[in-house]
Amino acid sequence: MADFRSLYRHGFARVAACTTRSHPADPARNAQGILALARSCDEAGAAVAVFPELCVSAYAIEDLFLQVTVLDAVEAAIARLVAESEGLRPVLVVGAPLRWGHRLYNCALAIHRGRVLGVVPKSFLPNYREFYEKRHFASGAGIAGETIRIGGLDAPFGTDLLFSAEDVPHLVLGIEVCEDLWVPASPGTDAALAGATVLANLSGSPITVGRAESRAMLTRAASMRCLCAYVYAAAGTGESTTDLSWDGQTSIDENGVRLAEGPRFSAEPVMTLADIDLGLLAQERLQAGSFDDSGRGRALTYRRIPFRLAPPAGDLGLMRRLERFPFVPADPGRLAQDCYEAYNIQVAGLAQRLEATGTKRVVIGVSGGLDSTHALIVVAKALDRLGLPRTNILAYTLPGFATSEGTKANAHALMAALGTTAREIDIREAATVMLTAMDHPFGRGEPVYDVTFENVQAGLRTDYLFRLANQNGAIVIGTGDLSELALGWCTYGVGDQMSHYGVNAGVPKTLIQHLIRWVIGTGQFAPEVGATLAAILDTEISPELVPVAAGAKPQSTQGVIGPYALQDFNLFYTLRYGFPPSKIAFLALHAWGNAGAGAWPPDFPEPERGAYDLPEIRRWLGVFLKRFFGFSQFKRSALPNGPKVSAGGALSPRGDWRAPSDGSAEPWLAELARNVPET
């Protein structure tokens, strides 16, 4: 089995989009350049290397395509490519003019380890503006089940070819040529519906102002629509500039995301590499049944050509950008847009619920922590939007045995700054009465701070809030977040798990602090509100249920259930994609293994920019799996209403996540133990 750190072990494959220097009508020199770059792709561990359209002959040679000397030289160059590919790992996808029957075809050849796997002719030939391909070539549309003679051997020929790796799960290559992408019903779409997970596009495409942007839009859209990876390579330096110019654009997209793009207008050969996630694509197709449904009723009969890649077994790194915080993009513009949408989703959801019920007042518990703070500023904005006074927010802080003066002061300051109807109810006396009546050791004066001690406080707070809502004709606003729901870090029933409407239920913990920063930075409220919010951001995350000695650190949530940074990472890849624990650990190692590598979200505190090694990742992933799969589903099965916020998913039993309350975590824990090393 491949090393744990090998990308090929976890459903990835490395692909390359290449542009060589062209030599018009000189196939021998072009083959030499292709082979040089192919060797570099092999050294880089690539599985597929895509070259430009007609790269063996060059694209812009006009009527020289019809010269026997050129066509014979093309076949000789192909013979050399085939022979010298024998010691190379990647499937080489190259473009060449080939004779078949009585016509000439603009073809893409898939070459691997000393043989031509197959030849795909271009279907759609542009014959407008600067293009006049029909002068030289015939369309390959409709050609299926045929063979073509190359170097004395027959190879499959037609638009019905897919190339499938026997030893790399889900690596299935489909090919289209330049204009094939630009038509409404592209050959690549049919190939994807027939099973292709990687689409290669060999392109000539001379450059004009704005065309690079159009190509990028098309390739990204194709990868998203077809749930595939799209590898694009356009002709570049060396092509004839008699009437046109060339930029050599190369790009790799996956499911609507640009993974990599190479330099344009380069005088040197370009090799653009990225690691595509075949497992992700397979899961997307599995989850989105409409993808498979859309292929039914279409004549999609393809020949699958098998090959063995023999992928590298060692550590090649991972050539793709990974967000440390999958719910929090590092790009400032993207983060600002996400925060705008997330906040307004929450506000709009609550406003609609208040309108639908005719309720004018809300009750909310405010602790001075992140979750209740964010919930309160959502409530305030919702009432503003409905034209209701903020005095209709009945905000209560309910200090218990471990409530710190700092968090209580922050709660009072925020409630006052927002203009709510604020009140404090100390629950310690009521909690002591209950614990004494239960004959709990604490009621006898013993310092026993067990889960019962904690949940009596959490339950009393919720009990008060619901009775206050009854008394005032209001609804209770839940403040618990998506991360706490995933980990079961909430008190069930008469506790913080329950409310009339949970505004934070779709918001992960790692996003909440950025939402609050966005609220401050965009001036959603008066400056005094912003100052209080900034103070709250500096507070340690703690349930404040267990008393601590003077000067000691308060009870730490993350010390018990794990760092939210890692647990939100684990949640995202479990919920959104259903990845196995070993793959999640592999991804976490690349995202979190080096604090100095990659981008951090803007304004993320420098002292908190840490790293996690594999043993830490393994440990906290185990905690996540036990709590998520084996312990906490019963709490989510009775989840109150609240809006879905993130594309990463939500945990409502009426929406994204439906699971049995009596499930077991054992299969996931066994996979973790079996496939993730301890060091």
Cite the ranges covered by each PLM segment.
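Enzyme catalytic cores with a strong preference for nitrogen-chemistry domains
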Residues: M1-G365, K381-R390, A422
